[in-house]
Amino acid sequence: MNVHGCPRIAACRCTDTHPRGRPAFAYRWFVPKTTRAQPGRLSSRFWRLLGASTEKNRSRSLADVTASAEYDKEAADLSDEKLRKAAGLLNLDDLAESADIPQFLAIAREAAERRTGLRPFDVQLLGALRMLAGDVIEMATGEGKTLAGAIAAAGYALAGRHVHVVTINDYLARRDAEWMGPLLDAMGLTVGWITADSTPDERRTAYDRDVTYASVNEIGFDVLRDQLVTDVNDLVSPNPDVALIDEADSVLVDEALVPLVLAGTTHRETPRLEIIRLVAELVGDKDADEYFATDSDNRNVHLTEHGARKVEKALGGIDLYSEEHVGTTLTEVNVALHAHVLLQRDVHYIVRDDAVHLINASRGRIAQLQRWPDGLQAAVEAKEGIETTETGEVLDTITVQALINRYATVCGMTGTALAAGEQLRQFYQLGVSPIPPNKPNIREDEADRVYITTAAKNDGIVEHITEVHQRGQPVLVGTRDVAESEELHERLVRRGVPAVVLNAKNDAEEARVIAEAGKYGAVTVSTQMAGRGTDIRLGGSDEADHDRVAELGGLHVVGTGRHHTERLDNQLRGRAGRQGDPGSSVFFSSWEDDVVAANLDHNKLPMATDENGRIVSPRTGSLLDHAQRVAEGRLLDVHANTWRYNQLIAQQRAIIVERRNTLLRTVTAREELAELAPKRYEELSDKVSEERLETICRQIMLYHLDRGWADHLAYLADIRESIHLRALGRQNPLDEFHRMAVDAFASLAADAIEAAQQTFETANVLDHEPGLDLSKLARPTSTWTYMVNDNPLSDDTLSALSLPGVFR
């Protein structure tokens, strides 16, 4: 234990004497020893810039991996029972300094080989140690992150910690738990998994295991559902301890600000159809450009003065910008405009089985259980002629970022951590450890082929794929959206190329399609490859044609355009050249691509082309890199600005959760109501048992606390819909949001306690049994969970407002 009373591991979350998320020992000044150069080694200065652990800590990990080889024979000579017993005898309580780490690695290597048939490479053991040090590791596709993660999970569990291996979907949670379960069992550890189909009892059992595999959604939904229970025995989610996150950049960056929502039945009205229809007419009008305008990167849309006048006239001559309508009618109009102008079918969503399904842009597949904020969801459904779905009342919500920050220790793994290093450091205080490949990467990455127009680019892509296919080399094509993937697929088929397509419309087939993408002559067209979870092996899943395909150059990756972040490009490139196999990649771009149009001055772009419309300037690569850096900077700003809004809500939620736990687990509710209403308490004490009276008091206090929090969330949602309009009055929207949120929260506690006192004093005494009639404290008859793809509010400043101590 360190001076903070926390295990000396890299995710100690104490804030009083050292930065949150980094251990005190990580901030001592070290003079690195001069050591022999290691594969993939970076300078210590570069490590510090990345927020990564010190050079000494990395050197210690390398030394431990080397030392573990001395124990390999001893581990191999142990029976299964003795191997399990040896694992249990390890002293790993102090993971940062334990002398038993080499023995642990040797036991883990032997257990993995016996139970999974996989013998971990040294780089996998190094990756496991860096995760045990609290870092996010970067390991290339095909290098064995799943096994490295299981070994790290075993290390934490043997140190007495409870580990949640956080995945991006249910399929990977169950697959990895069943795949790695025998390894953990061989080391005397228990493993469980959770999916959307798991019952409450199955969830409790899984969480009770040493290591639990579950998707980030399911973990979050369990946390939310626990905020409705009125009996401590109904709780499902345990206290958070260690989160080991697979595809860490996807979970911690791409989806960090996605709110997970618990909703209940309600009778709230949906947005007015007359406004949705009116906006549809505006957008479809031949003079539509006169009625609304979008910004340069198509992220925002607003009415022009002419458009506002037309809407006002159609709605009976109202003033959209009056106090009466600015926060209601104008907001509805803007939401409907967003649905009709900015959100495109087969790009942002698809329609299947008479329902709108969102597409996860970073994964290229349907975003399960995800929806837009209720007004926008209804507007899109109306746009597509689909019956509006029930919205419900938000009972509780938590962002993925706030969910993960609950854990005492956070670490993870991904193929593209370095590019997300800034966000990981800024929002989670996490370092990044790049892990060298087991075999040198010999993939050849060709310079971008840039065209003057999208049409010329698409022609070039089809010609290139056809040419590569004719020699039998397998091709993986990464597109940016569903519409593009289907259009390209159709063109290839017309050219006689037997391509298969993998996108959000057929993601159920993804494992089979990806597994065969390395076969001789295969052409696979796919939307984003992040988190697909299946390796592409040369020669197909059985590698029957491995040598033949390798001689042709291995898998050839084609990107149909740069993404807004380099990470997504690298995730696609990384599919080629796994485990030392040959491979190649090339990206096609045009001056009309979104990332270029939004981030470069069109008048300064070189325009000289060859006969096929390809730009001949040597500056194209640097210009594309610059456009991508600008786009990444904007995304970071959006993350930071949105975080500033969500952070206050997260802090308020933490106060509510603490108060709720106190009411749920102690006699506080009974004591407070006895003090507030002594006569009624004395009256009831003579009629009901102390245990029954305690239950009644707890139910009353919890109901009004939950009711107050749900009302507070609804109020904050209403504020956020129109807070940006405060800028018209020269007010800072963020400052105003914080002021209003803090003022409202300050009265929440008093109002909840006052309402509880009133219920306690006025509820009728039951005739047929001892107790009070609490039928008016009706909770939702049904609840459901989903994710909200929220539109981030943007602002440039953060005002530090303190939270009042509302509960004493």
Swiss-Prot record:
Keyword field contains Cell membrane: yes
GO process terms (BP): biological process involved in interaction with host; intracellular protein transmembrane transport; protein import; protein targeting; protein transport by the Sec complex; symbiont-mediated perturbation of host immune response; symbiont-mediated suppression of host innate immune response
Chain sites annotated for binding ATP: 124, 142-146, 535
Enzyme class: translocase
Principal location listed in the UniProt entry: membrane
Keywords linked to the UniProt accession: ATP-binding, Cell membrane, Cytoplasm, Membrane, Nucleotide-binding, Protein transport, Translocase, Translocation, Transport
SMART domains in alphabetical order: SecA_DEAD, SecA_PP_bind
Catalytic activity from the UniProt record: ATP + H2O + cellular proteinSide 1 = ADP + phosphate + cellular proteinSide 2
GO MF terms held by the record: ATP binding; ATP hydrolysis activity; protein transmembrane transporter activity; protein-exporting ATPase activity
Record keyword Cytoplasm present: yes
Subcellular compartments: Cell membrane; Cytoplasm
Membrane topology, as annotated: Peripheral membrane protein
CDD domains reported for this sequence: DEXDc_SecA, SF2_C_secA
InterPro entries hit by this protein: Helicase_ATP-bd (IPR014001), Helicase_C-like (IPR001650), P-loop_NTPase (IPR027417), SecA (IPR000185), SecA_Actinobact-type (IPR026389), SecA_CS (IPR020937), SecA_DEAD (IPR011115), SecA_motor_DEAD (IPR014018)
A GO cellular-component term linked to this record: cell envelope Sec protein transport complex
EC code(s) of this entry: 7.4.2.8
Domain of life: Bacteria
Complexes and interactors: Monomer and homodimer. Part of the essential Sec protein translocation apparatus which comprises SecA, SecYEG and auxiliary proteins SecDF. Other proteins may also be involved.
Function, in words: Part of the Sec protein translocase complex. Interacts with the SecYEG preprotein conducting channel. Has a central role in coupling the hydrolysis of ATP to the transfer of proteins into and across the cell membrane, serving as an ATP-driven molecular motor driving the stepwise translocation of polypeptide chains across the membrane.
Family in the record: Belongs to the SecA family.
Name under which the protein is recorded: Protein translocase subunit SecA 2
Organism: Mycobacterium tuberculosis (strain ATCC 25618 / H37Rv)
